[in-house]
């Protein structure tokens, strides 16, 4: 298996509906250790390229007949900076009205329930070799998430606009 030597900048990814998110590190049935991580869907050409250079990509069958298969990458979110080798990730949340907030270890959990409009991220590889097995795991370097406009806010604005038109 080739070892990955460069950071890969991924754009135009989907971490919305149907993807796994655990930025808060909550212990679950399928995540007994409470590992902070999330998954992203990748375009086929990006997924196959990353797989070719050593990344582990999950191939998901089509959800419905006629759909394309999906390619999923799990990304770790680590705040463990004991060795000083890697700084903690930079995570920003942009709201639909343009406000931007930086999220930290104790606030990143809000992304677990955020309705995501768009996301851009940078990941770094971590090449591992344990008990004769080797691979490459993706870790988050930087993430900017744009939240979808909440329906309540949209409905309130529409009502306000209608009231202004009536005046």
Model-derived segments and their meaning:
Residues 1-5, 149-167:
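Acidic, gly/ser/pro-rich intrinsically disordered tails
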Residues 1-85:
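OB-fold ssDNA-binding interfaces and closely related basic DNA-contact patches used
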